[in-house]
Every structure is written in C-alpha cells, then in structure tokens.
Amino acid sequence: MTRTPGSGAPMVTAPEVRRLPRFSRTERTLHWVHASAFFVLLGSGLCLYLPSLAQLVGRRPLLKDIHVYTALAWLAALALVVLAGDRRRLLADAHEIDAFDDDDLGWLRRRGNPQGRFNAGQKINTIVTTALAFLFTLTGFFLWYGERNHAFRLQNALVVHDWLMYISFFLVLGHLYLSLVNPSTRHSLSGITRGWVREDWALKHHAKWARALTRQD
C-alpha cells in the first residue's frame, strides 16, 4: 500500500496479474493463416453461390480465380508453417486434442470438470474443422480439375462443397461469439493474438493445464 502524492490518503496498489504462456508463434501463425484464408474463401464462395450476391458483385470469372488461388495459397501457407515452425509443439497439440478423458466427458455434460490446455469443446471444434478442411480440399479439387478433365468430374461434389460451407459458417459464428462477445470466454482471444492469458482466467477455464504450468515454475 502507498500514499497518493500530495495527500495523506492511502492508495491501494493492484496486485500484478500473472500471465501464462498459451500459444507459441507457430500455433498463432497457423491459426491466423487458416482464419484469414477461410474468410476470403467464404466471401468469394458466397458470391459465387448466392444468385443475389453474384448479380450484385458480378465478375464471376475473377471471383472463381480468387477462390481457387486463395485455396492454393492457403494450403501452401499451412504446409510452410508446419515445415518451418515448431513441429514438436504442433504434434503435442495433435496428441492432446485427440485424447479425451473422463474430465472431458464430464465437461460436455456440463459438470464443470477441470480442463487441460484445450477443453472438450475446443478439441471437438479442432477435429471438425480439420475434417472440414480436408473435405473442402477434396471436393474443391474435383470441382476445379473436373472442369479440365471430365474423368475427374465427381457427381455431387458441388452439393457436398455447399453443405460444408453451411456447416463451417455456423461453426465460425459460434467460434466468433465465444472469442469476441461472451464475457466469460473472450479473454481467450489474448492467447491467440498475444500468446498469453491471465492466470486467474486459466485457472477457471483450464485448471489442469494452469496448475501443471505453475508447478513447473
């Protein structure tokens, strides 16, 4: 406790907030490469898919080129980040995301079980997002190359591609709500932008991870 200069009134000094390192530079780069490409692909895809938007924007051949070349750049950038970045950290992430324990099942049943670095919802979101990315790439290849070689034209590829877009759209809406709007969870954005989160927040939302990290210190 200190005193305000020029007065006898005591001034309470707020305790220093401890920060816990959450995401590495490689993890953050991978996330933002995927996110930025997704929004370009979603925007150009909607303009190609919705007649009202297609008529408003026009220039359909240019939109198709933007869509295709953004997809190619997205795949190349993801590969570059994985090859040039911290692969050991990414592999550890994959192992943790793929492992579900009793606390994860309890969390899904809203029992408030303590969570690790990724909660059960984040694990499911990552698995679904990865599956969607793979299916988008697969159906997108058949749509693009099928126009050039009819032997690769896959029936219903466009229908599947469109349905993947619907699923992704609503998945991203939920993701944006939790990371930008919901007061309880929006501090998580700090982890993926600045690489750290407050210890008090981590203890509330990822208690097992936070406790393990503080024990290492």
Where are these regions (language model features)?
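Membrane-embedded alpha-helical bundles that constitute the cytochrome b-like, heme-associated redox core
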Residues: 1-217
